[in-house]
Swiss-Prot record:
InterPro entries: Poxvirus_L5 (IPR006956). This is Entry-fusion complex protein OPG094. Induction: Expressed in the late phase of the viral replicative cycle. Residues 1-30 are intravirion. Residues 52-128 are virion surface.
Length: 128
């Protein structure tokens, strides 16, 4: 065998001679404030509607059925009639889904079964 010279590597450590002044918060307050400002602007741009909904008072949406609560049902022969609607001053015929007047044999007996001898309001019928 041949004589092969051995080579040994020794680690060399170089000590840093500069300080990490970029990481100091005190010297770069304006940069930090600018970043915070940019973050708030981005939050406002992307979440503007959510922020408006959070800080604005909730609007009360009127229930369309509230206008019908004062209307009452009555029978005229075998026809079911509605009176007391806010937009109609006269008594009108109650209509079914297919827009035909509701005609029921023993209509008065049906209304008595709902509310006894008291007048039957639309609210009584809608709650059932």
């Amino acid at each position: 065998m041949e004589n092969v010279p051995n080579v040994y590597f020794n680690p060399v450590f170089i000590e840093p001679t500069f300080k990490h002044s970029l990481l100091s918060v005190y010297k770069h307050r304006l940069i930090v404030l600018f970043e915070v400002f940019v973050v708030f602007i981005l939050i406002y741009v992307f979440f503007r509607s959510e922020l408006n909904m959070f800080f604005m008072p909730k609007r009360k949406i009127p229930d369309p059925i509230d206008r019908l609560r004062r209307a009452n049902l009555a029978c005229e022969d075998d026809k079911l009639m509605i009176y007391g609607l806010p937009w109609i001053t006269t008594q009108t015929s109650a209509l079914s889904i297919n827009s035909k007047p509701i005609v029921y044999k023993d209509c008065a007996k049906l209304l008595r079964s709902i509310n006894g001898s008291q007048p039957v309001s639309l609210n009584d019928v809608l709650r059932r």
